[in-house]
């Protein structure tokens, strides 16, 4: 693509020196390791590295034009903008030919449930014989091909490149997790969402947003942009909102799109009544504008009823018949690391769950309480370099809602694991909770002690197959560790 086309896509900018001869831009990147001759290098200020400090490296490797927000002394044209991350999103959308406008885009935001909801949506549309794409915490997926991802919502270039690959592969519908951080940083600018889904909002990411008010504002941005200038047709946009959460009602005021509500309360357009949670699944009556159908799903827990309602509403908004949506949802067995049962012949039930927020942990434990008949073990830790105020809250929830809590490390990152655990212990001063810094030991101890009929919840990491210590990822999989510990116990026929 010609440099002039990219420059013209940015309304407010300065180009120094002025471009006298146009040339072809071969690629966009913010990573000097990726730079190829003819690249446009975008200098982004990151958490640990400032791209402006790497501009000379990028030019040495062949970058022909730079996007920056700080003064530079270089011998190639520089496009100066206020915010390079947001500029990157617009440039990527233009460079890759606005791929989101060629597919049905369903964005899902909220504190908990995004991964499960996007996977449920993907299953529904696959059963409609549609080619699907998925972008989220676990991976990016183009039809059946899975690609690794580093963030819930990748950077704008990666996202637009992925969407372009989906478009070129014939994908018709994309289910995409949209994080609050991505919304604030402008990573999804230029993406033309058709349906935006809100799951819930509870405490998370306050290390980034600082306050719940700012966190709420970040989530609201997804709904405010429905029908924005990027939309080819704003009249068919739909906001799918959980109105059991007061924030859902608030978001109604932020969007000009059509609104479809869901929840357990009967005032929601799509709601669930008579919920019955069992050890092997959940049953309820689904009401869609008053039309009631009994649903039996294999997913367990009230929180999964909300996830199912969100996915149902998103599919319903695009015209898929009720009975076909229900058929798809009833056959889903689960998502890796989301209230995932580890195979066991020991009489001990082991569940691995990604619950890394206070509300997520509470949901998981309350669900277990609905069917547990004996002791509940809860192996839980808190991440380092993240919101410290969650630590005492999660510790308190573990102590109050399980009979055998155990505190351990999660991803300590650059923090001292002992200090993280001390923060947790401080939240339950009157409790005597075993503490094992080594997560492997904590899991092994819990499963070794558990007796037939007991339930062991391993919380916090879910699908992750690594543990971050310092800045290094080490292989670690909660499901694998649980399986090893279970193998050492006697089996029960």
Swiss-Prot record:
Pfam families: Mur_ligase (PF01225), Mur_ligase_C (PF02875), Mur_ligase_M (PF08245). GO terms for molecular function: ATP binding; magnesium ion binding; UDP-N-acetylmuramoylalanyl-D-glutamate-2,6-diaminopimelate ligase activity. The keyword ATP-binding applies. Meso-2,6-diaminopimelate binds at residues 386, 410-413, 460, 464. UDP-N-acetyl-alpha-D-muramoyl-L-alanyl-D-glutamate binds at residues 32, 151-153, 179, 187. Its cofactor is Mg(2+). GO terms for biological process: cell division; cell wall organization; peptidoglycan biosynthetic process; regulation of cell shape. It comes from the Bacteria. It is found in: Cytoplasm. Carboxylation is probably crucial for Mg(2+) binding and, consequently, for the gamma-phosphate positioning of ATP. It catalyses: UDP-N-acetyl-alpha-D-muramoyl-L-alanyl-D-glutamate + meso-2,6-diaminopimelate + ATP = UDP-N-acetyl-alpha-D-muramoyl-L-alanyl-gamma-D-glutamyl-meso-2,6-diaminopimelate + ADP + phosphate + H(+). It is an enzyme of class 6 (ligase). Its main location: cytoplasm. Catalyzes the addition of meso-diaminopimelic acid to the nucleotide precursor UDP-N-acetylmuramoyl-L-alanyl-D-glutamate (UMAG) in the biosynthesis of bacterial cell-wall peptidoglycan. Belongs to the MurCDEF family. MurE subfamily. This is UDP-N-acetylmuramoyl-L-alanyl-D-glutamate--2,6-diaminopimelate ligase. The gene is murE.
